[in-house]
Structure formats: C-alpha cells, structure tokens
Swiss-Prot record:
One of its GO terms (cellular component) is membrane. Disulfide bonds: none annotated. The gene is acpXL. It comes from Brucella melitensis biotype 1 (strain ATCC 23456 / CCUG 17765 / NCTC 10094 / 16M). The lineage of its organism: Bacteria, Pseudomonadati, Pseudomonadota, Alphaproteobacteria, Hyphomicrobiales. The modification O-(pantetheine 4'-phosphoryl)serine is found at residue 37. This is Acyl carrier protein AcpXL. NCBIfam families: PRK06508.1. It is found in: Cytoplasm. Pathway: Glycolipid biosynthesis; KDO(2)-lipid A biosynthesis. InterPro entries: ACP, ACP-like_sf, PP-bd_ACP, Ppantetheine_attach_site.
Amino acid sequence: MSSTFDKVADIIAETSEIDRDTITPESHTIDDLGIDSLDFLDIVFAIDKAFGIKIPLEQWTQEVNEGKVPTEEYFVLKNLCAKIDELVAAKKG
C-alpha cells in the first residue's frame, strides 16, 4: 500500500493546496484535510487516470449516505488506498 499511498498523497497535494507533509495514512480527506467536494472530484479523476481504474464514487457516496458503511471506510486514506489496490487487482484479474 505504501507506494499507492505515496502516489495518492502526491495527487492530493498537487490537486489541492494541502502540504504533502501533512497527509498521512490516517488522514480523513474531508474531516482532517478539509477537501471539499469539487476538489475531491478532481482528486478522484486524477487517481482514476494515474491508476487506470474507475473509482465507483457515486456508489460509495450512496453507501455512506444510506448508513451502510461509515465515511472512514472510503475517505480515510489508508482505506481509500486499500480500495484502490483492490480495484487495480480486479482490473488485472
């Protein structure tokens, strides 16, 4: 996961105005980093492009809004990176 985390953290720092040094695996993209929905969409688009995947953001948001999963499941970086790794592995299938 560490290379995935580094890549994602770099994308977040480049896409937003967040200092790369403040981004950790425990960071919650919204609560800790203060990323707004527009910036998050830009970040997801950049992640999709960098990893050659399609993050199912609409599905994830719906699951969170319906209370099926806690926001931490998708929006804490270590968990987001694990999901990215799963999507990459599934694509390689």
